[in-house]
A protein has these predicted regions:
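Export/targeting segments at the very N-terminus of extracytoplasmic proteins
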Residues: 1-39
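Segments enriched in small hydrophobic residues
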Residues: 54, 140, 144, 205-206
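Residue-level detector of well-ordered alpha-helical segments, enriched
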Residues: 25-29, 79, 109, 137
Length: 217
């Protein structure tokens, strides 16, 4: 699939929604990704730029063309999720090679992210599909997926607040997506049918988006 949107954040939001995460889950995940990498798929952990002598661009290029051979074991966080542990970086690199994509390709990284969540972090993925608040989703990602050294209350608050900004922008109808060259504002409608709460994306024109799934929780 090709990513839809005018910016990395919009492309990431649309992609994750298309994979069945609910708006709270997407926002909570994106808040963490933003604090990790600024949503940049070529982001090299800042503290390692001087240590390794690379910028984001030169590191990515050197890994892609094979000039730099220590990507897996250099302990540097990389990409939108700042993958750091050697086995996860190894799997990321293998996935990129299988796809014939740059290690810094956004779509490839998003697909790999979903693969990780679907296989090794199923409990986190379940929260992202059923969360009832941004903070619930954000903490699930922080504590069980990203697992940074500092997981304290201040970090939890910061990441949840960052995620809330994405929720307010895209899930409340304040955001937009580009379709056939035109920006169309979207939002979410909620209804209770037979005791089941249903969310669905909508156009401001009132037409439903057929390619986005219903979310039940």
């Amino acid at each position: 699939m090709s990513l839809k949107g005018n910016s990395n954040e919009e492309r990431i939001w649309n992609f994750l929604i298309s994979k069945g995460l609910n708006p709270f889950g997407v926002a909570g995940l994106m808040g963490n990704l933003d604090r990790e990498s600024g949503l940049s798929p070529i982001n090299l952990q800042n503290t390692y730029e001087k240590i390794l002598g690379f910028t984001d661009d030169t590191y990515t290029t050197s890994v892609d063309n094979g000039d730099y051979q220590n990507f897996v074991h250099d302990k540097a966080g990389y990409g939108i999720a700042q993958w750091t542990y050697w086995s996860r970086k190894q799997n990321l690199q293998k996935y990129a090679q299988e796809k014939g994509a740059s290690i810094g390709d956004l779509e490839m990284q998003l697909e790999f992210l979903i693969q990780e969540l679907s296989s090794s972090y199923k409990s986190v993925l379940n929260v992202l599909k059923t969360a009832t608040s941004v903070s619930q989703a954000s903490n699930a990602v922080l504590l069980n997926f990203e697992k940074p050294a500092n997981q304290g209350s201040s970090v939890q608050k910061e990441r949840a607040e960052c995620g809330q900004k994405f929720y307010d922008k895209y899930a409340s109808g304040k955001g937009g997506t580009s379709i056939m060259g035109k920006t169309i504002t979207t939002g979410w409608l909620s209804a209770v049918i037979n005791g089941i709460k249903i969310n669905h994306a909508f156009f401001t024109s009132g037409a439903f988006l057929p390619f986005l799934p219903l979310s039940f929780f």
